């Protein structure tokens, strides 16, 4: 436990009164309504964490709406998810992001000069759900559907700094300890062994303010965050695994750091991914996308040129810092009685280092981005786009789910 303040405001959980947080958000429900967006893959419906999340959300009566951004391939899958979420008693809507109606809307946008047809995945789904949520929300919280350690106060912690009139933050990101107390293991390898040493490496090459900003976040890759609808309308959302990093870069460009904060969410665990044997799968795919996003940040925000020699230096320094961190985490784990496999951690650092070289070379040859357009631009082309998406969701329910 500490009370250190980073470059951005850090809200610690010394003794947060969760009941008071909920009461205050409830009191602001009319003037500052809050929504929650949950991106979900169809296969996650069968995972135990989602059932508990729904049970806990039923106690979050301060939420005006829950928007489920669903990736499903068939009508049967869509109907199954709609039926599954009937246990959620809060006002909610299931957005079938791959459904024929929304696909047609996306295709029609191409005629207006906004081509989203090549985008797919979580980023696109979050973008669609954000448009719908901003119709009636002052603030929007986001979190995934696989949180094992979910609790009723998680959305409240994310939303309170945004809706509280004495604070008025524009953006709030969660941070936590990725520790499983049942198995006594330390997780979060992509952040611990890749993102943090990479940021330290990049900062040593260029003392840019945006890198200082990134280093201030205690868990850069946290998928739990909240923001005002106004900010959500003005940021470009990345469409790949660089979502969390790219989003932070967009927030930096659109909001003063005085209005950005992070909050302690305690212990956290979720479904884990395998390392993968190449850059197209598992954690290696994630690391590749994240590294590419950071290279784009360096290109846009510093004087550094992404050359072969620059990438070689990054590769060497990253690997050294990663190996140094393994020794530190081993000491931390040993003192806390946590299981820690140093050999396995070394394997991860070696693999991540190889990804840096390959992803860096790819970026040099093709530095194009994978950012969705911001909603402000989309509405300038199609003013009623949000309403069209909402109406498509309602029509999907009527056609596929209501008994004839």
Curated annotation (Swiss-Prot):
> Out of the domains of life, which is the source?
Archaea
Sorted alphabetically, which InterPro entries does this protein's record hold?
GPGS-related, Nucleotide-diphossugar_trans
Catalyses which reaction(s) = an NDP-alpha-D-glucose + (2R)-3-phosphoglycerate = (2R)-2-O-(alpha-D-glucopyranosyl)-3-phospho-glycerate + a ribonucleoside 5'-diphosphate + H(+)
**Activity-pH behavior:** Optimum pH is 7.5-8.5.
Its family remark reads: Belongs to the glycosyltransferase 2 family.
Q: State the protein's purpose.
A: Involved in the biosynthesis of 6-O-methylglucose lipopolysaccarides (MGLPs). Catalyzes the transfer of a glucose (Glc) moiety from uridine diphosphate (UDP-Glc) to the position 2 of 3-phospho-D-glycerate (3-PGA) to form glucosyl-3-phosphoglycerate (GPG).
The residues that the entry says bind (2R)-3-phosphoglycerate are 188-190
Question: What is the native source organism of this protein?
Answer: Methanococcoides burtonii (strain DSM 6242 / NBRC 107633 / OCM 468 / ACE-M)
The cofactors it requires, by name, are: Mn(2+); Co(2+); Mg(2+)
What keywords tag this UniProt record? Answer: Cobalt, Glycosyltransferase, Magnesium, Manganese, Metal-binding, Nickel, Transferase
The enzyme class is transferase
- Residues reported in the UniProt entry to bind a divalent metal cation: 146, 270
Entry annotated with the keyword Manganese: yes
Q: Does the keyword Magnesium apply?
A: yes
Could you say which EC number(s) this protein's record lists?
2.4.1.266
What gene is it encoded by? Answer: gpgS
Q: How is the cofactor bound?
A: Requires divalent cations for activity in the following order of efficiency: Mn(2+), Co(2+) and Mg(2+) ions.
Stated name of the protein: Glucosyl-3-phosphoglycerate synthase
Q: What does the entry report on temperature?
A: Optimum temperature is 50 degrees Celsius.
Give GO terms: molecular function aspect only: glycosyltransferase activity; metal ion binding
């Amino acid at each position: 436990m500490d009370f250190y303040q980073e470059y951005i405001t850090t809200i610690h959980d010394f003794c947060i009164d969760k009941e008071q947080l909920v009461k205050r958000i409830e009191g602001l429900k009319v003037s500052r309504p809050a929504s929650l967006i949950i991106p979900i893959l169809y296969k996650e419906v069968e995972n135990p964490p989602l059932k508990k999340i729904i049970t806990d959300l039923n106690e979050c009566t301060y939420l005006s709406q829950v928007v489920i951004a669903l990736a499903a391939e068939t009508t049967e899958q869509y109907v199954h998810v709609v039926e599954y979420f009937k246990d959620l008693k809060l006002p909610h809507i299931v957005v079938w992001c791959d459904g024929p109606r929304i696909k047609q809307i996306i295709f029609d946008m191409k005629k207006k000069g906004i081509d989203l047809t090549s985008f797919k995945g979580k980023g696109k789904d979050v973008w669609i759900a954000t448009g719908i949520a901003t119709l009636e929300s002052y603030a929007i919280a986001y979190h995934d559907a696989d949180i094992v350690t979910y609790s009723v106060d998680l959305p409240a912690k994310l939303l309170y700094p945004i809706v509280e009139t004495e604070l008025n933050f524009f953006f709030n990101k969660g941070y936590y300890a990725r520790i499983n107390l049942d198995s006594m293991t330390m997780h979060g390898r992509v952040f611990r062994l890749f993102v943090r040493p990479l940021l330290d490496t990049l900062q040593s090459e260029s003392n840019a303010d945006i890198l200082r900003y990134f280093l201030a976040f205690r868990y850069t890759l946290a998928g739990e965050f909240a923001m005002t609808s106004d900010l959500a309308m003005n940021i470009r959302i990345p469409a790949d695994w660089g979502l969390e990093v790219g989003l932070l870069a967009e927030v930096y460009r659109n909001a003063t750091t005085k209005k950005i904060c992070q909050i302690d969410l305690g212990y956290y665990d979720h479904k884990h991914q395998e390392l993968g044997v190449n850059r197209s799968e598992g954690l290696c795919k994630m690391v590749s996308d994240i590294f590419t996003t950071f290279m784009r940040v360096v290109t846009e925000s510093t004087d550094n040129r992404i050359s072969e020699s620059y990438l070689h230096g990054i590769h060497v320094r990253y690997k050294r810092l990663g190996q140094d961190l393994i020794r530190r985490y081993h000491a931390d784990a040993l003192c806390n009685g946590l299981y820690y496999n140093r050999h396995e951690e070394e394997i991860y650092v070696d693999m991540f280092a190889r990804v840096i070289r390959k992803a860096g070379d790819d970026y040099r040859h093709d530095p194009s981005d994978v950012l969705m357009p911001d909603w402000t631009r989309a509405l300038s082309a199609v003013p009623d786009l949000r309403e069209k998406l909402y109406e498509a969701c309602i029509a999907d329910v009527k056609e596929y789910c209501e008994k004839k």
